[in-house]
Swiss-Prot record:
Gene: Lin7b
Disordered: annotated segments: 187-207
Name of the protein: Protein lin-7 homolog B
Tissue expression summary: Expressed only in brain.
Bias (Polar residues) ranges: 198-207
Organism (species): Rattus norvegicus
Amino acid sequence: MAALVEPLGLERDVSRAVELLERLQRSGELPPQKLQALQRVLQSRFCSAIREVYEQLYDTLDITGSAEVRAHATAKATVAAFTASEGHAHPRVVELPKTDEGLGFNIMGGKEQNSPIYISRVIPGGVADRHGGLKRGDQLLSVNGVSVEGEHHEKAVELLKAAQGSVKLVVRYTPRVLEEMEARFEKMRSARRRQQHHSYSSLESRG
């Protein structure tokens, strides 16, 4: 079990940094162009995505040691998550309440199918649909801090079922890969149907 840690206040810290930059701009002590550029970075969606993933990993990683050790390990894990998404959408954190009606989405793929695990359907009117943060085509990277990259389908299902109260998902949107995966599965199903039809026809001709 991960040790209890003080919750992070990174959003508050970023807001304070932005306020400081605004004061420095008014003072005229530093070149305003550079200050404005830094302010835009801190207020960007990319910075928010990094902060959300960092906070999610910091809260859930099972790490013992000082706050400095924990922060260093979390930073490495955050960099790894964004490096893995290079060329794709950046990771996002989606938190959903866990209720008796389920989470309201389906997944497909897994190690046994030689593919990532994907959100294949968001059920209309379900929890995920009402929340609005999850999309068909999202690749599932982790469930409550446990990575499911390279894992079997059943591992992700077990983690989702075991979640209590709420579930935090780290996902990234790569719909093209899902479409390719679905096309591959459909091709395999069509080949099986043709084979079954051929076998049935052969049996009929013998009869």
